[in-house]
Amino acid sequence: MAILLGIFEEGLIYAIMALGVYITYKILDFPDLSVDGTFPLGAALTAGLIVKDISPVWALPLSFFAGVLAGCVTGFIHVKCKVRDLFSGIIVMTALYSVNLRIAGMKANLPFLSQDTIFDNEWTRNSLPASVRPYIVVIILAVIALICKFVLDWYLNTRSGYLLRAAGDNDTLVTSLAEDKGRVKIIGLAIANGFAALAGGVLAQKQAFFDISIGTGTMVFGLASVILGTQLFHRFGKLKATTAVIAGAILYKACVAFVISMRIVKATDLKLITAAILLLILIISDSMKRKGAHYA
């Protein structure tokens, strides 16, 4: 049961980030590596605020808006400075390493074990029935992930959301509608990095500490979740893509946990496992596309 809870906990946290990757990878077709910097940005800001006795609840929206700002910078560098998309993300990701250290007080590790978090506070300790307490983390994470999903679903059905989709599929259409396709891209990158930073803040509160290396491989996890979810559940026509992404994140975390539980590799090889599983998913996904094209 503990392993299952761990899978859902980690999967739901990274599902929030994967929703952002879905925007950049699937909708905008933008290889945004700044996610590896905005994820720890959210964690660093959350840790810094909680250490200063700021409410852990308020720390999350503030982390989201910090990610939005970072995403705007990535978009500005790409759109206004005419820097290629890949390089824009790398520049911001690199710069955020120093920014995150400064936010954390120049500390590579910032614990706040004695502070209240959204998962461990007076209400969760004293007001909940004993039978519910073991599941409170999963419940809270599910609520946050679902809120993010429904907000994104709502946004994608607005005029701005339709323009965002068009910017990825046919940016000429955006221009023909007298809209600035560059501005639309910046908005998409802002929202995507906002989700990444929010996920980082949630993870920091779950672990009760910030670590500067917390964002390493974030983009890989997000890509794997998006590809796995959308490829595996695309046959279910009524299933929204955002739901598939969340399911993909949980399933991907389950795959990683399964490989570790087999004791073939050590837990310290987590990043190696993550990369290997992503490679396998990409190979299978490409094979499925080729078969589909062959029978079409």
Q: Residues of each region from the PLM?
A:
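Transmembrane alpha-helical segments in multi-pass inner-membrane proteins
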Residues: 196-271
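Loop-to-transmembrane alpha-helix initiation sites
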Residues: 10, 86-87, 108, 137-138, ...
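Transmembrane helix-bundle core of multi-pass membrane transporters
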Residues: 85, 91-92, 96-157, 187, ...
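Alpha-helical transmembrane segments within multi-pass membrane transporters and channels
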Residues: 21, 54-94, 99, 145-146, ...
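Helix-loop-helix "hairpin" substructures at the membrane interface of multi-pass membrane proteins
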Residues: 70, 131-211, 215
